[in-house]
Amino acid sequence: MAAVSLTVSTVKPLGDRIFIKVSASEEKTAGGILLPDSAKEKPQVGEVAQVGPGKLNEDGSRQTPEVSIGDKVLYSKYAGTDIKLGGDEYVLLSEKDILAVVS
């Protein structure tokens, strides 16, 4: 089996799935205390990197996704599958797990 090189451009989400680049979590508290990895909150904000074609409806049509590549979004805390690519963190989740588009 040939090795597959994963990059953001080679990841094509299926259905209503969205591929999000996770925003970096805070390294320090407001008081300047450095946080160990175990004490950091899991980020819930990121930028949409790839978008699937949309949910397939019962009649065979597709429901167009409400987000686009480049949108900054807020998503459910424990949603999706965490993926690391090239030192960056991503999450692959269903569109229903996106709570809001942040402007």
Curated annotation (Swiss-Prot):
Its main location: cytoplasm. It comes from the Bacteria. Keywords: Chaperone, Cytoplasm. SUPFAM superfamilies: GroES-like (SSF50129). The keyword Nucleotide-binding does not apply. Pfam families: Cpn10. InterPro entries: Chaperonin_GroES, Chaperonin_GroES_sf, Chaprnonin_Cpn10_CS, GroES-like_sf. Disulfide bonds: none annotated. The keyword Chaperone applies. It is found in: Cytoplasm. GO terms for molecular function: ATP binding; metal ion binding; protein folding chaperone; protein-folding chaperone binding; unfolded protein binding. One of its GO terms (cellular component) is cytoplasm. One of its GO terms (biological process) is chaperone cofactor-dependent protein refolding. Together with the chaperonin GroEL, plays an essential role in assisting protein folding. The GroEL-GroES system forms a nano-cage that allows encapsulation of the non-native substrate proteins and provides a physical environment optimized to promote and accelerate protein folding. GroES binds to the apical surface of the GroEL ring, thereby capping the opening of the GroEL channel. Belongs to the GroES chaperonin family. PANTHER family: 10 KDA HEAT SHOCK PROTEIN, CO-CHAPERONIN GROES. Heptamer of 7 subunits arranged in a ring. Interacts with the chaperonin GroEL. This is Co-chaperonin GroES. It comes from Prochlorococcus marinus (strain AS9601).
